């Protein structure tokens, strides 16, 4: 006995199943693109924070008496202000960091040879953990260190 063509009632569930599969693939792809975009934005913002801190630090003296070399990691009277500029965008500090979960403890400032001629300032952002909103890949990833080194400016002061 020959069967006739399939009726519409026997195919009614297939459209719903196809839509569910297609929508889940589309939504998964969309969330992956959003998370990857957030990670790239955070990468760029952290590099910019290191540059912002270094630009501020080169104009701040690392040693009070002229002619005394100041070299070392996390030294200088302007350390807190440099960290605040990198994190909050303001030397006085703030309550909301420019990048989520960035703290002043993530910012290292190194003065080299300040006080005698031209020194350099290196500002680095280390140990930053990027947190995903939707934990598709995982919950956090470690971002690389962001380093910026600039030559100090005399700002018209002769040591």
Segments the model singles out, each with a brief description of its role:
Residues 2-3, 43, 48-159:
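Short, conserved structural patches
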Residues 1-12:
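N-terminal leader/signal peptides at the extreme start of proteins
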Residues 23, 38, 47:
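A cross-family signal for key residues in well-ordered alpha-helices
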Residues 15-34:
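Alpha-helical hydrophobic helix detector
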Residues 33-36, 60:
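Alpha-helix C-capping/helix-to-loop hinge sites
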Residues 11, 18, 35, 47-51, ...:
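A broad detector of short, well-ordered amphipathic alpha-helices
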